[in-house]
């Protein structure tokens, strides 16, 4: 744990609090900004039912409803995935009017399709929210529903956010829930789950070959394994290069790459029925997997395509506080100042 003086020193390090010139033209949250969303539609290559095929690596992006099994066939064709990573919308504007019963029924439909599209031995990861002001829904009923599905539960992972929403009468909410299930008996690459956090706790002595050794000597790595509580994943916010403005609750590239590294091999097919900001697509590209992804919204399909093209062209993971449609729509959607102080900078200085 860093001392207060160390945190201050890190916060004042060159580049951390430096107000470097940053493109400050973000898109507003698209699920609650219908006017902006409508402006972006003419620039989208896909319409409902359309499929974009990547000629270089074989990735495919389809504009379809994840709960429509017939439409999904146009995305996967004869492919079978060894890994599925789903981040279904659970707190976006479009779902605020759905009852929990309707939401779970919708989840059952795309999960049934997912099971059929997975290989005999495959892994499934689902990101889901747990609203502590609403009986921990939809996570609570989702987990009960999964007990009736043919998947086998393997782990309940918590990702710790650096920021959260708090109250004077409750614990601050800083967790994200990630459920891990399997079909059959898929391999698990332990090397893929090692973090960059160095091992500092010594002890746990054990005699091996007549020699008394402690745990660090016996380990094959000088860093710790992730376990099922991840504290080393930086929550995406506007000053990160990977930020894709307009995409609410964007998942970090690092956590997605960790999942792909642990639960698939190079050349495998990775399935994602909720493309959103294109994080799974980009992670698969970087780790030499083939991604089959979809989104019901043509705008998010286009953002995913452009993010892949942007990465190949520039090596950058996102647009920071700019956006994917600036060539077509250069006008500012935000009145924030380029000189606004970065409130996250001090939070970034702490490891946890």
Question: What are the roles of these predicted feature ranges?
Answer:
Residues 146, 308, 312:
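Conserved hydrophobic residues forming the short capping helix/wall of the S-adenosyl-L-methionine
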């Amino acid at each position: 744990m860093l001392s207060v003086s160390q945190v201050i020193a890190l916060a004042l390090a060159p580049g951390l609090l430096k107000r470097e010139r940053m493109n400050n033209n973000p898109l507003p949250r698209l699920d609650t900004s219908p006017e902006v969303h409508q402006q972006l539609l003419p620039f989208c290559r896909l319409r409902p039912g359309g499929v974009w095929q990547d000629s270089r690596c074989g990735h495919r992006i389809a504009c379809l409803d994840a709960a429509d099994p017939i439409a999904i066939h146009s995305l996967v064709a004869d492919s079978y995935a060894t890994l599925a990573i789903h981040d279904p919308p659970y707190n976006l504007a479009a779902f605020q009017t759905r009852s929990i019963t309707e939401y779970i029924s919708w989840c059952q439909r795309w999960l049934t399709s997912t099971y059929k599209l997975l290989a005999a031995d495959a892994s499934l990861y689902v990101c889901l929210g747990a609203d502590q002001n609403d009986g921990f829904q939809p996570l609570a009923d989702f987990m009960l529903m999964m007990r009736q599905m043919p998947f086998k539960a393997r782990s309940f992972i918590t990702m710790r956010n650096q920021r959260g929403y708090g109250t004077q009468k409750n614990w601050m909410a800083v967790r994200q829930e990630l459920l891990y299930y399997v079909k059959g008996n898929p391999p698990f690459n332990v090397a893929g789950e090692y973090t960059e956090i160095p091992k500092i706790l010594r002890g746990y002595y054990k005699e091996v070959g007549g020699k008394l050794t402690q745990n660090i000597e016996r380990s094959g790595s000088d860093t710790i394994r992730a376990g099922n509580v991840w504290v080393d994943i930086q929550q995406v916010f506007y000053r990160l290069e990977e930020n894709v403005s307009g995409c609410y609750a964007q998942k970090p590239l690092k956590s997605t790459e960790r999942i792909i590294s642990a639960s698939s091999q190079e050349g495998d097919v990775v399935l994602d029925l909720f493309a959103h900001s294109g994080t799974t697509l980009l992670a698969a590209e970087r780790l030499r997997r083939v991604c089959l992804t979809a989104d019901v919204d043509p705008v998010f399909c286009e953002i995913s395509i452009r993010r892949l093209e942007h990465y190949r062209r520039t090596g950058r993971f996102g647009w920071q506080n700019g956006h994917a449609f600036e060539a077509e729509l250069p006008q500012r959607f935000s009145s924030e100042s380029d000189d606004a102080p970065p409130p996250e900078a001090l939070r970034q200085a702490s490891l946890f």
